[in-house]
Amino acid sequence: MKILPAALAVGMLSLAACSSQTKDTTTSATGDPVGLKAVVINDALPYSTKNGDAWTGLDVDVLKAIQKEQSEENATTELSYVEVGSVSEAKDALTSGTANIVCGVGFSWKRSRQINYTLPFAVGGMRLLTTEGVDGTPESMKGKQIGVITGSIPANLVESQLPEADAKGFDSPDAALKALKDGEIATIAGGALWSKANMAEVPGSRMVPVRPYGRAGVGCAVTHGNDALLASGNLAIGQLLQGYIDGDEESTRIINSSIGSDSPVGLEADKIAAYYNSVLGTVAGIGKDE
């Protein structure tokens, strides 16, 4: 099953048309494209991690795909990274204009008032990474301490879904994971893919419950007004998803090395492809004649 590039582009651009129609800030007054300034957090597998001076992870590969898409549409677009240490710093970077895009973020209706989301390239939700004999249900977590990343969607889900648990805040995913490794805390709440990617770092740990709380798509987000950047992001992500479905070598490498069979997450290829088909089916026709 294939989506013709033209049909895919129409679907992606129609998404941007549904976003806010405010001033487009992806080009300067001279018409030159504004560089991609991406928020990144270190040690946030499978999305982003820093090795020396180089960033790797699913977010980085997606950002490079968006950079390539923008460079094909305009002149060469530069990609730079704005490293932050907490969710609050990430929000500040976006609202201040220091950064104009962030990837690896779960969809939230509340946050959609401030930012526009691209197509998702993964699906997440909140799961608990724990060394205790709990099953992750509200009953089993009564009175239990749960580490959360302050300001994150999982932190909000702990508050709403596990109200009788005792939430302990950490500034970053790395700080929460370190506390779990050191035995400072027995359970932390994180994105489902993040929890799976880091489970091997904590001997004897497991993920609960079986089904995540607050299951939602994971993609990139830009501030309102960046309509052309949103369109480029949607087109690049759509092509990445379609490439994976069609067995494109580079698309398959990107996805499998981050969340597929070649990664600690280990999602099955047919399940990834089924999800990507469902995503693309909402924005462009997929059929034998296309």
Locations of the language-model features?
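Extended ligand-binding regions for polar small-molecule ligands
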Residues: 19, 57-70, 134, 140-145, ...
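Bacterial N-terminal signal peptides that target proteins for export
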Residues: 1-7
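Acidic, polar ligand-binding/catalytic clefts
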Residues: 75-140, 206-207, 211-213, 280-287
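Extracytoplasmic small-molecule ligand-binding "clamshell" domains
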Residues: 24-105, 113
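Bilobed "Venus flytrap"/periplasmic-binding protein-like clamshell domains
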Residues: 42-45, 53-72, 106-107, 123-181, ...
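Periplasmic-binding protein-like
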Residues: 41-43, 122-132, 196-238, 259-286
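Immediate post-signal peptide segment of exported/extracytoplasmic ligand-binding proteins
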Residues: 19-55, 135, 139-145, 275-290
